[in-house]
Amino acid sequence: MENGSRSKLLEDPYVKRVWDLIMGESLFKKSPEDLASLRESLRRECLQYFARHSPYYVDLFERLEIDPAKATLHDIAKLAIPSDMLRGDGQKRFLIQDLEEGGETFSSSGTTGKDPVRVYRSPVDLAIMLKANTDLFEHVYGDVLKQGEGVALFMAAPELRYKLSFVAFVDLTLDKKGIELLYGMDLEDKAQAGTPWQKLTTNKENLLKFLKSKKEPKLFFTAPAGVHILGQKFESMGFGKKFAYKLASGAPPIRLGKGGIIVTGGGSKGFADLPPYPQLVSNAQKHFVSKSVEGKQIETPFMDVLGMTETLTALIDRYGVMDKVPHPLAEAFLLDPLTFEPIEEEGMEGILGIFNPFTTSWLEVFYPGDIMTWHSSKGFYGKEFVYKRRLSVKEGWDLQRACGGTLEEMMTKQ
């Protein structure tokens, strides 16, 4: 955050405006109409910003006959790229000329046999990523993560902090909040047919520490496979083993305490043989116990984060309360799979497109290959998004899975 606040890019009026909006008063208090108007102005200022900082975009806008000062959502749809174009060094062509060093590069797993998607985040982008995602998370969570209170378990390995953006966001946010983060997995390097690959194995010490902790709230971050596998483990225990485990750890059930929650990453996709997400939630609620912040016993709440390497901010939902919503300044839209024109009709399936006007290093507008629908909402965004499925290889689509899917593959690979 400190490096971002010292960025020379803040001398640009657009970056300064975006920074002030992200770091300022809550955007979630604005009406959907005010936010839509704000996104429209940012859309146009954003394209003008990139035209000032890279001749690549000047040429691109001319070729596509886009006037940045009058840019519409249809123009943004024309600018959207498939995530495949970011594999290897693909992002380099899209980066601004006066790119600032000192940031971090995130990548996909590379387990598909192709070059992984790699995306560089400058110091100012990292600061915006941290603040924007934290604000969105707390809004959907329904409360502020209080400084130094609680403990979190992430069913991932610490090495993935510097690889997967979902892990990085959680790590950075909890570090900023002074909340203890335990990693529940270790990374094991193996070789298969001469190709290195990685497998996640359980860190029993950290898992036990989380289970025995008296801190509240307990935040459990995992791919959907993680919570499913843990539930199956409890169900398969005999009486004697379950009794011994309960003496050692206090579980089952796993008590998450006041404000305790399970946060999954990426929905129920990946290569695990998983039940539908509603069934996964129902099964898990037999083994996890939570209380409201007031101390009342409730069904353990679930949140799901749809994030991928390519996006600075995620879409997040809270099961049974709200479907997926983006950050107030992010533009989430659906594209017709045949025409790639924006879909305006409610309830129609389309390819998710994401435009983040607050990303300063490259014009972050892309489609990762997820089919979704949208419906009207009384919330801050005016609409919510429902995940349906990935586009398949048979449909001509062979792109990157979200971070949660990557974690699932690592957790279930034999």
Regions flagged by a language model, labelled:
Residues L35, R39, H53:
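Hydrophobic (often cysteine-bearing) scaffold residues that line and stabilize catalytic clefts
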Residues P82, A157-L160, G226, T309:
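Short, internal active-site loops enriched in acidic
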Residues S109-S165:
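Conserved adenylate-forming
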Residues D67-H74, K146-Q147, K291-F302:
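Short, surface-exposed acidic
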Residues Y49-S107, D115-S122, D135-H139, D143:
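Active-site diphosphate/adenylate-binding microenvironment
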Residues M1-P32, E40-S41, E45-Q48, T173-Q414:
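Active-site glycine/GP-rich loop and adjacent strand/helix microenvironment
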